[in-house]
Amino acid sequence: MKIMASGPFTSWQIDEEKMETVADFIFLGSKITVDNDCSHEIKRCLLLGRKAMTNLDSTLKVRDITLLTNVHLVKAMVFPVIIHRYESWIIKKAEHWKIDAFELCGWRRLLRIPWTARRSILSILKEINPEYSLEGLMLKLKFQYFGHWLHRASSLEKTLIWWKIERRRINQRQRMRWLNGITDSMDMSLSRLQERVKRREAWYAALHVFSKSPTWLSDWTAANNEGSEADIFASKFY
């Protein structure tokens, strides 16, 4: 039997049976680490998504299948692999770039564009014409989850999300909280978001619009001369 502990414990014994202490484990398809860092899980999901994209190669190369159908295939068979349990992630800026790089690599593979072609992100997105980006879908699902538990009177998830440790972190940077990702993405205070969520129909309509709005990928494109440097980053990632 194995156990994970956050304190300085070297050995555990239960009924005279010694427990093995581990730093991480897979639970319900997600990787849980002792430091609660989501970067390991994000990297793992992106690798699984890359494998799913590779398995689709033979199908995507069939010329009788239209581009629109291939785009729907990627969204139906690759995107869900990556966004599994996404609602619980705390994403840093570096992870945002990796997610966008993965999506760009997928579209380039779908269009069979070599890296030597030096196509910009903007031209690729115009040709694919996706209804929403991978990150836009992720944000929509995360905000739906946020609205769902906020509507509930009481739940374990609500208690865990609102709870925070009062003890100060000495000589360390303050960790990013899950709620910070919500407020930063919507550019609203938490109290204002709570008022928005109370109007359910308006809230879900806003999420539908927000999921199609520009995300990190478009900001990346504008900041890097229509994606030239971003293409280089994506090629190294893939």
Task: Locate the predicted segments by residue.
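Short linear motifs embedded in intrinsically disordered, charge-biased segments
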Residues: 1-238
